[in-house]
């Protein structure tokens, strides 16, 4: 399956590795040129994962059209408060048959909507059809 991971931070990079390890073709999108260049050239993301090496099969791009081209699954791993702004820019590129998994936590400050509700509102999808993946670590 071709997967577009949108967000090249710690969570996006980690999920990209897990998805490649599961046998998927993965491309990661990010805004930071230095991070994208490092992922492509050195298979690392030192700003997020320190010395951890990423799979050689992982490619990265700053071009959202390239990232979404042919994607069967989109994994959202961008900052929560930038979700609406990004989706408004991208919505013409995201067809209704592409599955979406949101890893975003919290609520949109300006509307008090959950991230799945923002996705539903902007993309015109039933919020029950949006998968939400979260992970919280508890230290006792």
What is each of the regions a protein language model found here?
Residues 61-64, 69, 73-137:
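Rossmann-like NAD(P)(H) cofactor-binding subdomain of soluble oxidoreductases
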Residues 51-55, 78-79:
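Short, flexible loop segments at the rims of nucleotide/cofactor-binding pockets, characterized by
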Residues 54-57, 66:
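N-terminal Rossmann-like dinucleotide/flavin-binding domain of flavoprotein oxidoreductases
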Residues 27, 55, 103, 107:
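Conserved short-loop catalytic and cofactor-binding motifs
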Residues 1-51, 59-62, 89:
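NAD(P)+-binding Rossmann beta1-loop-alpha1 motif at the extreme N-terminus of oxidoreductases
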Residues 140:
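Calmodulin-binding IQ motif helices
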Residues 21-23, 53-55, 95, 124-127:
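Short, well-ordered coil/turn elements that cap or connect secondary structure elements
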């Amino acid at each position: 399956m071709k997967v577009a991971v949108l967000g090249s931070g710690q969570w996006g990079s980690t999920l990209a590795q897990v998805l490649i390890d599961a046998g998927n073709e993965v491309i990661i999108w990010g805004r930071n040129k230095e991070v994208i260049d490092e992922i492509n050239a050195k298979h690392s993301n030192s700003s997020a994962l320190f010395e951890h090496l990423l799979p050689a099969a992982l490619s990265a791009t700053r071009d959202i059209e390239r990232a979404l081209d042919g994607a069967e699954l989109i994994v959202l791993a961008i900052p929560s408060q930038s979700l609406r702004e990004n989706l408004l820019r991208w919505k013409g590129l995201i067809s209704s048959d592409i599955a979406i998994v949101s890893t975003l936590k919290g609520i949109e400050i300006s509307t008090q909507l959950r991230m799945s509700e923002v996705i539903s509102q902007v993309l015109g999808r039933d919020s029950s059809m949006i998968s939400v993946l979260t992970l919280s670590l508890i230290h006792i």
